[in-house]
């Protein structure tokens, strides 16, 4: 009986690890997998063309340096927080405020259902850290992109940049737009 309980415990722990939100790439259809591509052009030349572009920190930094104001949304389709807002709403608010909007998805889950008009869908190029594009990869990606750690900048999904310089990380996109 004890061996059975140990085996059941191991199986349940393994199941949790397997189902923990990661890339979810293996759950994409073959057509969707073909639409996940390495970004080979400047980010500001991309359009919302149904593809997910895998980007590096260097590509993102070059993009940020070329813009006056940028709001990056660290998008997670599985997020249930009141602060996880439909990207189309944020895109509209950014357009009104004259702020460049950028989506960086931390998972492929639901990424092809994002409805935005003009914003290309970006994801972290998973091989840059030798890890999958899960929680740890996004944390390291944004640590390097902001020049801070999540402990010092606080946890938020919205990153504000002015002329390539990180200004803050916010829970609420409206604060990221106003800088308050």
Set out the residue ranges of the language-model regions.
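Short active-site neighborhood of thiol/selenol oxidoreductases, capturing the structured segment around
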Residues: 61-90
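C-terminal motif of bacterial Sec signal peptides marking the signal peptidase cleavage site
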Residues: 12-15
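Conserved segment of the thioredoxin-like fold in thiol-based oxidoreductases
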Residues: 94, 100-138
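N-terminal "domain-start" segment that seeds a small globular fold
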Residues: 17-66
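Thiol/disulfide oxidoreductase modules built on the thioredoxin-like
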Residues: 131-180
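Flexible, charged surface loops at secondary-structure boundaries
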Residues: 62-67, 95-96, 151-152
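Positively charged n-region of N-terminal signal peptides that target proteins for export
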Residues: 1-4
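Short acidic, S/G/P-rich loop/turn micro-motifs used as interaction or catalytic elements
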Residues: 76-82, 108-110, 129, 166
């Amino acid at each position: 009986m004890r061996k059975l309980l140990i085996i059941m415990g191991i199986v349940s722990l393994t199941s949790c690890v397997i189902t923990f939100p990661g890339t979810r790439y293996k759950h994409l259809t073959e057509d969707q997998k073909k639409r996940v591509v390495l970004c080979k052009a400047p980010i500001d030349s991309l359009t919302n063309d149904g593809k997910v572009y895998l980007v590096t920190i260097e590509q993102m930094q070059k993009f940020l340096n070329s813009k006056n104001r940028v709001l990056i949304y660290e998008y997670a389709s599985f997020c249930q927080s009141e602060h996880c807002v439909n990207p189309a709403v944020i895109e509209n608010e950014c357009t009104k405020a004259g702020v460049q909007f950028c989506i960086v998805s931390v998972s492929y889950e639901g990424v092809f259902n994002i409805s935005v008009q003009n914003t290309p869908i970006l994801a972290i190029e998973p091989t840059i850290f030798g890890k999958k594009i899960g929680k740890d990869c996004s944390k390291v990606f944004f640590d390097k992109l902001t020049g801070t750690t999540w402990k010092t900048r606080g946890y938020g999904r919205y990153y504000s940049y002015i002329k390539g310089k990180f200004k803050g990380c916010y829970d609420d996109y409206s604060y990221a737009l106003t800088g308050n």
